[in-house]
Amino acid sequence: MSVAISIKNAVKRYGDSTIIPDLSLDIREGEFFTLLGPSGCGKTTLLRMIAGFNSIEGGDFYFNDKRINDLDQAKRNIGMVFQNYAIFPHYTVRQNVEFGLKNRGVPAPERRAKSEEFLRLMQIENLADRK
């Protein structure tokens, strides 16, 4: 199996606190991988670093041998389900639903059709234009 995600010497700090001091790991293609640890140990921080939502203070992050440290988050092609409330309050419900598709360059008519499908599936089509 080839390595799909490789992290070498990752470091993350918040002020004077080092959350991730020096982490290296390889996750192979098709491998089932779990991050386990107590609250505040850096699990979500690491996932946010991989997705591009948090800065990387040290180390190198690779997807299939391609370094992604400086790759824009929209081009990383990673989905993330947030633990807490994570919508854009200035967007409508539909715009929030379409956000990921728009970042991936999906044409507007296709985004609209997909958002309609998802809104129907969730039975919230009546809320589509609400902010």
Regions picked out by a protein language model, each given a short descriptive name:
Residues 51:
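Helix-to-loop junction immediately C-terminal to a conserved catalytic motif
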Residues 65-67, 102, 107-128:
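Conserved ABC ATPase "signature" region
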Residues 57-67:
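ABC nucleotide-binding domain "signature motif"
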Residues 36-38:
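The feature captures the beta-strand-to-loop junction immediately N-terminal to the Walker
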Residues 91-99:
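Short coil-to-helix segment of the ABC ATPase nucleotide-binding domain corresponding to the Q-loop/switch region
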